[in-house]
Amino acid sequence: TSFGAGNDPLWIVDGIAVDNIGFLNQSDIESMEILKDGASASIYGVSAARGVILVTTKKGKQGKISLSYNGFYGVGNAAKKLDLLNASQYAMLANEKRINGGGNAYFPNPDALGAGTDWQKLIFNSAARTSHDISVSGGNDKSTFFGSFGYYNQEGIVMRDISNYKRITARLNSSHKVFPFLTVGQTLNYTHVKSQGINSNGEFGGPLSSAINLDPTTPIIETDPAKIKSSAYNNPYILRAPGGNPYGISSLVNQEMSNPLAFQQTQLGNYNWSDDFVGNVYAELKL
């Protein structure tokens, strides 16, 4: 056991110690080197106890100005969904349980319910992933430069309206030979991240747990006037769909399992964002 050190390695990006490299555009990375020997601890201290990873970003080179672009587009989907009961099957099983317990059948006509609500189909969606990177570099025997701009956008496969990640990066690295014995330069990086995630275990559950546990006999939106007048919907703060009808509430499942569509409405606009500037200015003197 070590004190003063975490489980993560120490990241050194262009000579700067950082907690992680989430702010970096992968296209800007020139090389990565892992240091595992004891010498790293003598250089970087106790924070290097778990190892050191040196990251060097791209620099400009002498020659003509070079312009490059790299991009891709892809779509992701859930690899597999659980094979759950439909509404008719669920109703038959619920009736059997009640009858075996000495009660009356809860559903008078299970076959009439059909497939019912597929909660997994409601929350899972195709998720697009887009990346665009453009860079320019060049220089002469006196100065070199490398500049880049990156855009990355990824939707979540679960309710993409409230699960997504967007990152914009900009970088400028340059080096200037002021005198034959003196070179100065800088590495500057700006990153803007805007993201939205889904709580998997909140006070009222989450879309994933609800999609698995909610019964298929409950509709996404309740349209039955008789049920809307019941005590379950007798709440002025209950969430309603754009048409005015309330989102379906299950009378069979623990109420901590919220309607995923109602949950989605409470999370719209709930974003996290950050703006990070990382850089350094250096001078190299040859004696």
Predicted regions and their residues:
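N-terminal periplasmic accessory domains that precede
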Residues: 1, 14, 48-71, 134
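Short beta-strands and strand-coil junctions in structured, solvent-facing domains, enriched
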Residues: 2-4, 18-20, 38-43, 60-63, ...
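Short acidic/polar hinge/loop motifs at secondary-structure boundaries
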Residues: 9, 14-42
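Membrane-embedded beta-strand positions in outer-membrane beta-barrel channels/transporters
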Residues: 14, 52-54, 68, 131-133, ...
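Short, glycine-/polar-rich solvent-exposed loops and beta-turns at beta-strand/coil boundaries
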Residues: 24-27, 44-49, 125, 162-164, ...
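Transmembrane beta-barrel domains of outer membrane proteins
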Residues: 35, 56-58, 135-139, 171-175, ...
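Surface-exposed loop/interface segments of Gram-negative outer-membrane beta-barrel transport/assembly proteins
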Residues: 61-116, 157-163, 171-278
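Outer-membrane beta-barrel transmembrane strands
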Residues: 124-143, 150, 167, 261-287
